[in-house]
């Protein structure tokens, strides 16, 4: 179940839909997001604005999620995974690897993301599979 929650986040990301992100994320002032190379974002308004910016500047994005580890603590689910990414920005196709930590909190029987931290992988090796 916890891995399914993580997968829903990447489905929302892949769809480039802010409406889907609205449903995945908590909307409190204490949630946190750190995109690779960005400053710390705190609170849903700042985080939502970051997703709008990313989606407006991305033509398409595909993920192959590997090396997933999940820990469950009562009402918290912590996932760590490798995002194998193929994205199109403008006319350029970019492949990259991002190590991510995603934390979800169960509230009123629904799991919501409260933390996302992505870090670029040095010396990333592209997997030998198509991400499309």
PLM regions: where:
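A beta-strand edge to alpha-helix "cap/lid" segment located at domain peripheries
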Residues: 1-23, 30-132
């Amino acid at each position: 179940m916890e891995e399914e929650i993580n997968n829903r986040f990447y489905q929302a990301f892949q769809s480039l839909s802010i409406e889907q992100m609205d449903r995945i994320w908590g909307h409190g002032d204490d949630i946190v997001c750190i995109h690779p190379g960005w400053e710390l974002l705190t609170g849903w308004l700042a985080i939502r604005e970051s997703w709008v910016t990313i989606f407006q500047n991305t033509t398409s994005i595909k993920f192959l999620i590997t090396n997933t580890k999940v820990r469950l603590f009562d009402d918290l689910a912590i996932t760590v995974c490798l995002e194998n990414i193929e994205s199109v920005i403008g006319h350029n196709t970019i492949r990259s690897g991002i190590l991510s930590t995603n934390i979800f909190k169960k509230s009123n029987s629904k799991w919501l993301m409260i933390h996302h931290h992505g870090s670029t992988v040095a010396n990333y090796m592209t997997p030998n599979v198509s991400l499309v």
